[in-house]
């Protein structure tokens, strides 16, 4: 019991622990030896839904960082094994990655939901391992999608190197066993900057960003084309359309109840939704699912790499693998340009954002792999995104609420309605 309490107390203090709103109630679901550590799986039963945490631990005589210490043992200190090279290099080797040239590793700080470890080969950082802290049964879209894109030779994602699966007891599943991905490794991109930081600077300085926006349009189209060729696609059925419309209206009802300005516009928004339901819909396929400027990296020799294909964080994992509308990714990027403009340049940044949007759309439409963009359907998806943003900002950052409200008004303007 004391061991579980010590480990649980440490887990509850970590940034990746998702149960901040409740008092945790942990139990050890599984513990098995792995190279360099013991992999503990802790179930937190205290929330509305149980959550399973991945906690590899090892014992050392002397810890290298105080934050890694989980507790004391008779023979030393119990620490987070992600801080120990025997475990991290062992995990890489389990994935089938050649570790013969690995000379060191370090844990990246700032991660919110996972733990990322960078490995040096011959003194240069070349590999990054993402260790998932919250585990889910079944496919992880971040792994599946990046593997497929890398295998297809896509120049728009980091090269995929390997992944590692684990299984654990689950009485609710066939044979009493669940399985899922505990981590994956890919090429580490040196000297990159995220698109959000670059775009924000450009908007603040009113620098032309249209060439970068065009390159982004080509990259997103290329990813859509590769995913459509390699993974399942499907025609949008009447049931798909009905379910999408219900989700739009559910988010609109929530926003209208919390944001008076959205309530004032709800009839006009719903009219756009109704019009979109009558338009031709593209085939459904795998998409990024949570695309914005923070999910793209500019590499030093030019071009973009798209990362973090986990999908919308609030959606259940199994839903994120379901084929979806490619224009949803496009809408996410259009809204991201608006955010960069509003926060970087203020009220005078509308022209900058409009130029970025136009350049992105033109390049996407003309690139190989792109999906036809019906303007009314795209506008409905932009509206849905802005409506969701309005709820989020009203709850968390009221000072930012004007940004999605301006986006809603722009999408309702006559020239946006197709």
Task: Identify the residue ranges that each predicted region occupies.
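ATP/Mg2+ or Mg2+-diphosphate-binding catalytic cores
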Residues: 348-351, 355-372, 376, 380-418
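Exposed beta-strand-loop-beta-strand "reactive/processing" segments of non-cytosolic proteins
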Residues: 19, 24-54
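Hydrophobic residue at the +6 position relative to the catalytic HRD Asp in the kinase catalytic loop
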Residues: 294-298
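Conserved ATP-binding subdomain of kinase catalytic cores across diverse folds
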Residues: 37, 45-250, 302, 311-345, ...
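Pre-DFG segment of protein kinase catalytic domains
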Residues: 286, 305-308
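Conserved catalytic-loop position in the HRD/HxD motif
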Residues: 290
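An alpha-helical support segment within catalytic cores of ATP-dependent transferases
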Residues: 100-104, 251-287
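Short Lys/Arg-enriched alpha/beta "domain-start" segment
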Residues: 1-30
